[in-house]
Amino acid sequence: PDLPRHKGISILILDTREAGFSHTVIPTCSNPTAATYYDNVKVPADMLVGKLNGGWQLVTSQLNHERLGLGAWSDKVVGLFRRVFLWARARDENGRCAIDAPWVRSQLAECYARLEAMRLINFRIAADLEQGRMDVALASSTKVYGSESAIEILRKLSEIVGASGLVRAGSAAALLLGELEYEVRASVTLTFGGGTNEIQRGLIAQFGLGMPRAA
């Protein structure tokens, strides 16, 4: 109680078979997650991770790595972009291509530009990690830009393919085996995983721009 905030936290590994531990599944529009409960659970001291009272450093390090991973999600939509691009170039029964429309070319070009920008950011991050560096502001910036870019790219791809892109997998009418529809739903969770994008903008201001913390 006498330590400053965040300084008295320790991380322990818990065997989920221990008495008192339970969990419930929480379905979401993306992958399911879970809530965990600890009712008088006792954990042996030798299950300590790292140093005693050194847990907050582990938590923040994990969060930064999680943000980098979430920001890199835009790489996951590269495959969908390429498939939509090929679909747009293919001719229908009337000999027409979706890519003939100027607005489709414009949308595809913006998607490509965002993906290339994110790819360069990911290369920068990979180089930093190889050198043992972790920039808090860059991790948060990557998460914000990457997650919001993924949502925007998927939205544009959905506009290009039309109503068929909104049909779930398993239906004969599903375009691209329903992958685009699923990723559109799943991408929403990127904005709050690892800390909401609003929180990330505060971290960018604090650690990247040297601005004071919000009251």
Say what each PLM segment does:
Residues 1-89, 93, 206, 211-215:
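FAD-binding core of flavoproteins
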Residues 64-215:
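Alpha-helical interface subdomain recognition
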